């Protein structure tokens, strides 16, 4: 900015990182650059909410997505849980998968739905797939295992047979 001779800069939100907070703005002002802060501040805070939460609390940003029927069930009367929601909700699911670094499911979801847990939005990056499976019940034939070489997948378990552990590592 200084090298290019830019005379006016707009800053939507200040960086809360204590290592840099406000220092860049001050350097620009010290060199005669007019700096206006707070332009579209709410939008900028929303855009950077994941980073801001981590940098100020050192805690991860966690979002939960849950689908249920009008009567509070997570599956239809027939037991089908794949299509409890409509098309818009499924699109939003893929937006969330694009936005967040990881997706966590329990072994029950894997056994019931055999999900891919990938992002189907153009140019979307697949989230790391994390499965909580305390007894290592994950089927070697499921979509998550079949595609684990292409999409990072973590299976968290407390116990399980050594043969299955080896097979999953391959």
Segments predicted by a language model, with ranges:
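Active-site ligand-binding patch in enzyme domains
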Residues: 1, 53, 63-70, 74-170
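Short acidic loop-to-helix transition motifs that present clustered carboxylates
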Residues: 17-20, 42-46, 110-112, 137-139
């Amino acid at each position: 900015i200084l090298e290019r001779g830019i005379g006016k800069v707009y800053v939507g939100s200040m960086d809360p990182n204590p290592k840099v907070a406000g220092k860049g703005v001050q350097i620009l002002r010290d060199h005669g650059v007019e700096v206006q802060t707070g332009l579209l501040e709410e939008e900028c805070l929303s855009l950077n909410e994941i980073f801001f939460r981590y940098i100020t609390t050192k805690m991860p940003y966690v979002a939960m997505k849950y689908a249920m029927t009008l009567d509070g069930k997570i599956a239809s009367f027939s037991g089908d849980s794949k299509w409890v929601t409509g098309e818009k909700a499924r699109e939003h699911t893929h937006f969330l998968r694009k936005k967040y670094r990881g997706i966590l499911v329990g072994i029950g979801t894997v056994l019931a739905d055999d999900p891919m847990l990938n992002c189907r939005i153009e140019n979307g990056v697949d989230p790391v797939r994390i499965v909580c499976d305390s007894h290592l019940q994950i089927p070697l034939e499921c979509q998550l295992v079949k595609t684990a070489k292409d999409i990072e997948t973590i299976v968290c378990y407390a116990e399980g047979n050594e043969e299955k552990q080896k097979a999953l590592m391959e």
